[in-house]
């Protein structure tokens, strides 16, 4: 690798290929993960145990040569366990700050819905502000700071569901899902002697990522596509069965993520296809459905799918 930032698309392609060495059959998930990372957001992975969520986060961190921390969320986890704490140093007769796991580049917040709302809020505020306040002192987080949170969609006993306002902090929510039987056989073969994570290293630098983020923000998007995004998000606010639609934050997130995806594809501009591909991962988790709609089987993804069919894309 050069010391100078690589071409942004080349950077993202190298990272994607490196992560896929470990996460076989998960190209679509890696694609969304990189769009969120490059777009400056955070992701919530919602899937069953054993689908590779932890491995995905570790592979991304290794590909960037980035700092990585994993934090298991439990009911007794405190905000100070995430943010850090000031401890009095008897020798120096002064308080010393001991940084918590949030001070890293890639943070895996495992089973975030198992912690209390107060503890969840401590992390989600850090995600939104890029800084934390401990004992009256504000401290900036390390850049880049990327959170990959997970939750199990099946188990609900002993969990604290994230409220809509907190879900809005995540640029995307998606489920990696199970790979095909053929890919699962290949995964078994890969792990006969050692874990594939041991065989990968850094293929890009944090400076390369910073360059990719700048390039993504500069990807052109036509005025009619901005209106298309606003129309899609706006329709969720009046959709049947929706108590609370997506906020303008969803519009901004969809634009930023679509720009990042266009960069990953090597496109010179955002297309309707980029917006449509990311609409559900960006918007669906932000919708609050009324109880009757949920009981009848309506989902946030279903609402977004209906909106995409109802709103014509610009030619």
Describe every region a protein language model picked out.
Residues 37-74:
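Walker A/P-loop
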Residues 89-94, 115, 119, 127-219, ...:
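Canonical AAA+ ATPase core
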